[in-house]
């Protein structure tokens, strides 16, 4: 836990001390450093054979830490669809654009995360670039109370289950969303 806490907080000297005293670490150490945008901590961990995995990239993306993400990719860190999804969920359009320029895969999770967090600009960009979406995209927008996102998604033919969207909006206290979903179509 000491290595994780040090990495998450960006305390390189604490991490060095912990490793000198045989404190165990895992791929989460690098992922937590990336999540906090602590590039120097990440570099040190990798120089000392700290393990990493795709979580390093998706946590860097979630935090909008493009410098960390670039460095990780330049040094061979794997990534997957969650990198795009977490960038979208964090509202980090510049990061999402960069990862797609560098051929990071995506799936409907990118649209879902953008909708869940109310990031309409990110969702628009993703759809303009042919990112898939599903009924879950509308469901997540309704759950988050993001009426503008839900309206835009429906105007652009995103599939949905109106009953589920209304129910989840009610459950989450988003009366305006539930009313809009239940309103008769013009």
Predicted features along the sequence, with ranges:
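Ankyrin repeat (ANK) tandem alpha-helical domains that serve as protein-protein interaction scaffolds
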Residues: 1-186
């Amino acid at each position: 836990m000491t290595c994780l806490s040090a990495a998450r907080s960006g305390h390189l000297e604490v991490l060095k001390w912990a490793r000198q005293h045989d404190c165990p670490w895992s791929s989460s150490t690098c992922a937590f450093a990336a999540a906090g945008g602590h590039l120097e901590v990440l570099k040190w961990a990798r120089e000392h054979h700290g393990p990493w995995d795709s979580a390093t990239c998706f946590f860097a993306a979630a935090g909008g830490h493009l410098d960390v993400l670039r460095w990780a990719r330049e040094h061979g860190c794997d990534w997957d669809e969650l990198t795009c999804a977490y960038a979208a969920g964090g509202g980090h359009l510049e990061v999402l654009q960069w990862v797609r320029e560098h051929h990071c895969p995506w799936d409907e999770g990118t649209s879902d995360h953008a909708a869940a967090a109310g990031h309409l600009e990110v969702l628009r960009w993703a759809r303009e670039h042919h990112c898939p979406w599903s009924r879950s995209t509308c469901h997540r927008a309704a759950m988050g109370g993001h009426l503008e996102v839900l309206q835009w998604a429906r105007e652009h033919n995103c599939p949905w289950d109106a009953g589920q969207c209304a129910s989840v909006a009610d459950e989450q206290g988003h009366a305006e969303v539930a009313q809009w979903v239940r309103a008769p179509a013009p």
